[in-house]
């Protein structure tokens, strides 16, 4: 039959992408009442306490700050929204672990003893580990990189990182868990000069999947959280080529309100690179070019660090959960490891909590300064404001420092692997976190204030005598 047959092709109507226009940075007036400071923090999802807001206000009252800002045409006594958002991400509980670092007045009611604990982290985690490091030769890198590094053999180092992704998994079980596992994969990739992720692990704690009681509005049923989290971890690992080698699941009523989602990755790196450098030591220098490679920046993941530092409520924004793309990350991973072995990388870290504000801000501590151009950052869509570009946690991005002599070779390698790359900053020695958008300066923060200016939290704790009850195991019949 040679007669023509018509084929009906269904037509799909796709929504048009909204065309947002770029908005100039706003000035945030902090010379207001305490109540207004709290309102600014809460409505902006900044997760800053009143004391922290007051500390920021005091910074902008200093004459030396006025003088430094004058030459950059910045408001002298008030932060821009870019600066305030950057401080909020850097000072968030998610990034600073302020509870672990708090000064705690402790009262043991059982013995009557009172004591002061100046940072649980420093006294009960850092000090024992540092004491151990003095006695062994296999603890190579602790407490200052994306993961800890130990010597595994004469030729290989091993690194392990585990972190939680609880709030994102409560709002979007699939997306929250996927970005949790691919994010911790990037932590391994961003350790030292780059490690290869070889295995994933996880522990999940959910409410009972057969729960039949009431649930608050906008809270997913535990069975949906279970299936979504499991699928997100599985897909994130499989599409990145990294197997999940073990895990555990716990069910308990305590996890109905918020699940506990641990995602972990194991990585390996050669002890020495072909050029003789030790793989666990970053070597940036003034003038190095800072690239953002991999994915683009979008509206997803904005306020991820601050929202996860707050109590989960019905108003918690789902936009704080990032959108994962493991295949893009796989291409980037292969390219980074090849660049490492070719000697192109001087420093590397991932774009996780806080986005570029965190990654470049942390790397800048090595040289004591940086200058960022947000206008050079590739975007998923137009119209993002300066502060949104700086703190967005859009996934599949690494920040990589390269010596200017290796610029062409690095870019050719990225093109070969089809990995997008853009020079977004340079390292300086000014002591400043200097952010521009094109020719205009939109943020100017001293690095020491950005990283060490957060006031120490003060807490009280009590220990009461425990009353143990006899445990009667259920019978086999029960």
Regions found by a protein language model. Give the residues of each.
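A short, contiguous, amphipathic alpha-helix enriched in charged residues
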Residues: 364-376
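Short amphipathic beta-strand starts and helix->beta connectors
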Residues: 374-387
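Short, solvent-exposed beta-strand edge segments and adjacent coil->beta transition regions
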Residues: 395-397
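Short amphipathic alpha-helices within nucleic acid-binding modules
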Residues: 406-412
């Amino acid at each position: 039959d040679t007669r023509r047959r018509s084929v009906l092709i269904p037509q799909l109507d796709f929504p048009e992408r909204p065309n947002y226009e770029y908005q100039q940075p706003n000035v945030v007036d902090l010379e207001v009442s305490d109540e207004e400071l709290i309102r600014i923090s809460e409505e902006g999802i900044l997760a800053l306490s009143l004391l922290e807001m007051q500390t920021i206000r005091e910074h902008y009252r200093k004459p030396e700050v006025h003088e430094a800002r004058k030459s950059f045409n910045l408001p002298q006594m008030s932060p821009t929204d870019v600066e305030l958002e950057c401080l909020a991400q850097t000072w968030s509980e998610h990034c600073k672990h302020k509870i672990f670092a708090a000064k705690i007045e402790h009262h043991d009611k059982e013995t009557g003893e009172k004591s002061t604990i100046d940072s649980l982290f420093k006294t009960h985690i850092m000090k024992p580990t540092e004491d151990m490091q003095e006695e062994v030769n296999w603890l190579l890198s602790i407490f200052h990189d994306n993961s800890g590094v130990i010597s595994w053999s004469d030729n290989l180092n091993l690194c392990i990182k585990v972190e939680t992704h609880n709030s994102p998994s409560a709002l979007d079980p699939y997306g929250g868990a996927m970005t949790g596992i691919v994010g911790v994969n990037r932590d391994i990739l961003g350790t030292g000069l780059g490690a290869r992720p070889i295995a994933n692990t996880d522990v999940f704690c959910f409410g009972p999947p057969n729960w039949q009681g009431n649930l608050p509005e906008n809270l997913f049923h535990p069975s949906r959280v279970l299936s979504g989290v499991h699928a997100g971890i599985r897909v994130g690992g499989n599409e990145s080529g990294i197997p999940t080698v073990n895990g555990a699941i716990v069910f308990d009523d305590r996890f109905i309100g918020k699940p506990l989602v641990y995602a972990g990755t194991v990585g390996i790196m050669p002890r020495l690179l072909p050029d003789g450098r030790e793989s666990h030591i970053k070597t940036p220098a003034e003038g190095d070019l800072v690239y953002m490679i991999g994915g683009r920046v979008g509206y997803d993941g904005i306020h991820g660090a601050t929202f996860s530092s707050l109590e989960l409520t019905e108003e918690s924004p789902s936009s704080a959960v990032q959108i994962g793309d493991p295949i893009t990350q796989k291409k980037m991973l292969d390219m980074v490891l090849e660049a490492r072995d070719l000697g192109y990388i001087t420093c590397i870290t991932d774009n996780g909590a806080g986005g570029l504000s965190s990654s470049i801000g942390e790397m800048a501590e090595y040289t004591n300064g940086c200058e960022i151009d947000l206008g050079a950052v590739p975007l998923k869509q137009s119209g993002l404001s300066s502060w949104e570009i700086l703190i967005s946690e859009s996934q599949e991005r690494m920040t990589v420092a390269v010596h200017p002599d290796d610029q062409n070779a690095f870019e050719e390698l990225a093109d070969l692997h089809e990995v997008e790359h853009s020079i977004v900053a340079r390292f300086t020695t000014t002591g400043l976190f200097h952010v521009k958008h094109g020719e205009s300066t939109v943020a100017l923060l001293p690095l020491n204030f950005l990283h060490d200016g957060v006031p120490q939290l003060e807490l009280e704790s009590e220990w009461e005598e425990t009353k143990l009850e006899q445990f009667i195991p259920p019978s086999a019949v029960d």
